[in-house]
Amino acid sequence: MDYQEILDGIGVPLLLSPVPLEGGGYYLPDAFEYGEEGALIADGTLCGEGLELVVLHECGHKITGCTLSKLSAPQLHIVNEAKANRFMISRKAEDYLVEIDYMANYFTPERFLQRFKLSVELFYDMAEQEMKKIAKKNKHLLVY
C-alpha cells in the first residue's frame, strides 16, 4: 500500500510546501479548511523515498491516535514522534520484505536501515521489533 492510498483511506489531503520544511513535514489535525481530518504538509523539495518516509511518519501521527495518560507537552511530543516513527518503519519494512523477495537472510534491521538511510542509533530497536512482527506474520512466505 503506498502512502497516497493511506492518505485517501484516512481522509487527509497532502499539501506540498514549495520551500524546505524543518523536520520534513507536519500533520495539522486542526486544519479544518482542508477537511474534517485536517491536512498533512510535506516538504515539496523532497522526492521519492525521502518524501515517502516523511509522509508515512506524519500519517502515523493521525493513525496511531493519542495517549490517554496525562503527560507534559514535551513528553507527549516524544511519545507521538515514537508512534509515528514506528508506523513509518512498519510500513517500509513490509515493502522491504517484498523488495528482497522474502529472503529471510536479508531481512535484518541493519540492511533495512541502510537501505532507507535511517539512523542505526535511533531506529535499530524499533526496526528489530517491527521486523520480527512482520516476519512472523509472513512466515509462510519467507525463503531460507
Label each PLM-derived region with a short phrase.
Residues 1-144:
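Active-site hotspot residues in diverse enzymes, especially metal/ion-binding acidic/histidine motifs
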